[in-house]
Amino acid sequence: IDGVPLSISAWQAPREPVPFAEAIQNSFEPVSLGWRFGRAWSTIWLRVTGEVPMSWQKDSVADLAPEIQIDFGYNTSRSGFQAEALAYDLSGKPIKAIAPKNSWLPWSINNKQIDFYLEVAANPDVAGEYTFEPTSFGDWDTAPETALYELKTLQLSRRNVQVWELAQDIWTIRGLISSLPQDSSRRHILIRAIEDMLDALDPADVANSVASGREKLEGVLSSPAAPAS
């Protein structure tokens, strides 16, 4: 929920990746959302700055977790063969890796000033549709100069932790349902629990009804796989 824009500047490494200490000595130029970048196998450094809104600091809520959302135009149906990044603090200490299915960076509400670096590797999709046919993208010297990625999202947001936890609850129960026999009584109990959760959840106000929805799933999530002998 929410969304606060951040200031972004970039430096393109000439060819081979360089260490953090060398990269940050270069001149970073301002870029904005929609910027296209990253010919195959190139490395781009981003500096990201901003500030946590004062209203967030005053109204800090445990269930709202600040995080940096990052999207380089990812195809989230797959985890590899795309751009990946590593976030660093100002001292050069790695904070967290960024990838298509893991494209967020946690941020403390108490860390008012946002200032960090991203080392972005513009990996090309050499697999295609997993046919692994010959491709010019397999080598720097044969790859085209075309920019492969777009800076679609880079902002500070707040994630509703309880809504996220509900999504994990549902994912877990769906996994159980799919693994149980069709005539299993437990399978039907799980399906009924999902139905009860949906009845308790207000689709027009998920944030304020999520607790009621999760409550309907507590019983089936806490019960053992089989009765104790």
Language-model segments: residues:
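Carbohydrate-active enzymes and regulators
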Residues: I1-S229
